[in-house]
Amino acid sequence: MKVTLPAFEKARVLVLGDVMLDRYWVGPTGRISPEAPVPVVKINQIEDRPGGAANVALNIATLGGQVQLAGLVGDDETAKALTLGVQTLGVEPQWLVVNDKPTITKLRVLSRNQQLIRLDFEEEFDSASSQALFKQSEAMLDNVDVLVLSDYAKGAIADPRAFIAKARAKGVTVLVDPKGSDFARYHGASLITPNMSEFEAVVGPVKDEADLIEKARQLIKTHEFSAMLVTRSEKGMTLITADEPELHIPTVAREVYDVTGAGDTVISALATSLGAGSTLAQACAIANTAAGVVVGKLGTSTVSRIELIGALASHQGESGFGVVSEDQLAYAMEQARLRGERVVMTNGCFDILHAGHVSYLKQAKALGDRLIVAVNSDASVKRLKGDGRPVNQVDRRMAVLAGLAAVDWVVPFCEDTPERIITRLLPDALVKGGDYKVEDIAGGAQVIAAGGKVEVLGFEDGVSTTSIIQNIMARQ
């Protein structure tokens, strides 16, 4: 299945559930305590990261989605640290403060990238607090397309059935990351995402693939779920619906470094993809890729759109060169700069490629290690050149350019000038051919402000697309 990323910024998601603070104490260890047979860790680094439902919200924000977050916290310093953590990515949380309970905290002690111990500071919230949270959050359902219930069995989602029904009645897709052995609590959800151990806690041991599918479909029927996605560690994921063939997606993780928060990443990628218009199958494939990225990181982490683009390109066998999207190009440029390569960019219509173009592009490539050619769309060329142009459609123009040895990447743009795309990409050098003045080149000021250079190269005299067209017309 060919996977393409949707416009994540279109997704509007409400995340409601058990929020917590993941705190890390990190330091070296070189001796055993004389008091007990345990290592002594000299702490030299302390880091706080949003966890649980808060990590789901951060993952959605990192991908570019619009996200609202609701959860239960205590009246303490930990709540302030958690608030600060989610605000770093523009998420304004809607907490319900429970004065007699602490904000849930998971403290992990690490040394040499290994977790030595985890200490949990928590008390389960009561059902009254949970129902108050649901009531406080009802109005938020009017402004979202997807609801994520992130359940860690800490009390924030005591009985969500009425809230799920209200969300579905408003046309909101409801995703649940479940906990515990009672899936009846999530009756009517659109999609539920148990891992294998959570699934078997409900249905008992699974003998084989057929048994898994049968038991999943029974749960779907009993609890009126639309679908179930069972995450299966090294075996990937399996998507089951009531009456369609199951879809198995193999794992894409190259290295498993830390599984902390992997489930959060899965459901956040699902929510953002579905909210942006992906099909369920596409959303599951995107979530699978995101999980493969995040398990290669230490601790509770997020996955960016650029990381997803790189992972998808790698798994789908794409070279990273030739005709690319803007997102693919942004990732490719990032990788090129990590290799110490200088990136040059130029732009134009390139309607009928001729010797003057080829000579110019060779000169441009000589100014760096990699050359980007941004190409005007068909509509843009028509606005600039008039009726009858372009002679060649943009796909054909880009294919010819991509075949030149001097050109590394070709990307289309639809505006009359390339200022927007240049401002986004900010190449090390921006090149234009002809008699332009540097100060008149679109995007030049932005490149210079970022520390880059802008240069003007000459075109070969007497050679142009217009003259070629005129010569052809004269011979007819």
Curated annotation (Swiss-Prot):
Family stated for the protein in its record: In the N-terminal section; belongs to the carbohydrate kinase PfkB family. In the C-terminal section; belongs to the cytidylyltransferase family.
Subunit-structure text: Homodimer.
GO molecular-function terms, A-Z: ATP binding; heptose 7-phosphate kinase activity; heptose-1-phosphate adenylyltransferase activity; phosphotransferase activity, alcohol group as acceptor
Biological processes annotated in GO: ADP-L-glycero-beta-D-manno-heptose biosynthetic process
Organism: Shewanella denitrificans (strain OS217 / ATCC BAA-1090 / DSM 15013)
Pathway connected to this protein: Nucleotide-sugar biosynthesis; ADP-L-glycero-beta-D-manno-heptose biosynthesis; ADP-L-glycero-beta-D-manno-heptose from D-glycero-beta-D-manno-heptose 7-phosphate: step 1/4; Nucleotide-sugar biosynthesis; ADP-L-glycero-beta-D-manno-heptose biosynthesis; ADP-L-glycero-beta-D-manno-heptose from D-glycero-beta-D-manno-heptose 7-phosphate: step 3/4
PANTHER family: BIFUNCTIONAL PROTEIN HLDE
Catalysed reactions, as listed in the record: D-glycero-beta-D-manno-heptose 7-phosphate + ATP = D-glycero-beta-D-manno-heptose 1,7-bisphosphate + ADP + H(+); D-glycero-beta-D-manno-heptose 1-phosphate + ATP + H(+) = ADP-D-glycero-beta-D-manno-heptose + diphosphate
Binding sites annotated in the UniProt record for ATP: N195, M196, S197, E198
Keyword Zinc: no
Protein name: Bifunctional protein HldE
